[in-house]
Every structure is written in C-alpha cells, then in structure tokens.
A protein has these predicted regions:
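Charged, flexible cofactor/metal-binding loops and thiol motifs
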Residues: 21-123
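Catalytic metal- and UDP-sugar-binding loop of GT-A-like glycosyltransferases, i.e.
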Residues: 10
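A short, surface-exposed alpha-helical micro-motif characterized by mixed small hydrophobic
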Residues: 1-2
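Short, glycine/charged-rich "phosphate-handling" switch motifs in NTP-dependent
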Residues: 6, 18-19
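Long, low-complexity, intrinsically disordered cytosolic termini of multi-pass membrane proteins
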Residues: 122-150
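Intrinsic disorder/low-complexity signal
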Residues: 16, 103-104, 136
Length: 150
C-alpha cells in the first residue's frame, strides 16, 4: 500500500482489477482481489478478519477456461461468467475491473445467458453420451452404415 501509486491484480495472465492504490485497498471490486486482500495477515490479534477461502478447480494456464478465467473458483459466478470473458469497466475514475457484476448491459440480460448456457450444457451432454456409446461399441460405424443403407 505504501510502495506504489497503482495496483494491477492479475489471474492466469488476465487483468482482473486496476487502479489507484488507495481506491483498490479501500474498495476492492473483483472477487479475486477481495480474496487476496482477505489473506493478508493483520498484526492485531484482536482484529476479526473474514477470510475468503477459494475452492473449486484451479485452471491450467495452458488451457484456461472459456469466459472469465476466475469463474471456476468464484463465489459470485453466474452463467454468463462461464461463457463470456468480461470487459474492462471503468467503475469509478481510474478504477477498472473485469467482472460481469459491474457491467450493466450484461446484468440486464442474465436470463438470455442462462438459456444459452443450458443449451450449451445440453449439447455437451448429448455429445458426451454419443462418444461414450461409440467407445462401448467398437463396431458402431459398421452398424451405422448398415442402418443407413436400409
């Protein structure tokens, strides 16, 4: 806090939050920034700090997830987070955050993203089921060709 004028918080090589040091410390917006700050030890043993414990899968930097890179560990995760990478929003002067929670356009269209995610999940489940069937039956292609000829 006393070393720099500005802070940039990154996760898997992506900017999550950026701004003036005092603003970020006083008003962290991104769930990852909040979790980081909650892990900072406080020298006062009487001070009660609420720790944010991150759970969920830590994604591979070589194969990051679709959408927000933090969604696999975020307690605020919504369907849109799994689909779209968030835009950088200037929440207040010189305080930028990449989180759908602060994007009015996205927040006003959550139902659309919920439906789209359900459709994508259904399609993925059907594809997985077909692949499992094909693995069970090594002769699936021959059977498919015979059925097709009939």
């Amino acid at each position: 806090k006393y070393i720099t004028d500005q802070i940039l918080v990154m996760y898997l090589g992506n900017m999550m939050e950026y701004g003036d040091t005092d603003e970020i410390f006083d008003n962290p917006l991104h769930p990852y920034t909040k979790a980081l700050f909650s892990a900072v030890p406080v020298p006062n043993p009487d001070a009660k700090m609420e720790r944010i414990i991150l759970s969920g899968d830590i994604p591979s930097p070589a194969n990051p997830p679709k959408g927000c890179k933090f969604h696999t560990r975020c307690k605020e995760c919504m369907s849109v987070c799994k689909m779209l990478e968030p835009k950088y929003i200037e929440h207040t002067k010189n305080h930028f955050v990449a989180c759908h929670l602060y994007n009015e356009e996205v927040m006003n269209n959550l139902a659309k993203y919920d439906e789209e995610l359900k459709r994508e999940e259904h399609e993925a489940a059907v594809k997985k089921a077909l692949e499992e069937e094909m693995l069970k039956d090594k002769n699936w292609f021959q059977k498919w060709m015979i059925k097709r000829k009939k």
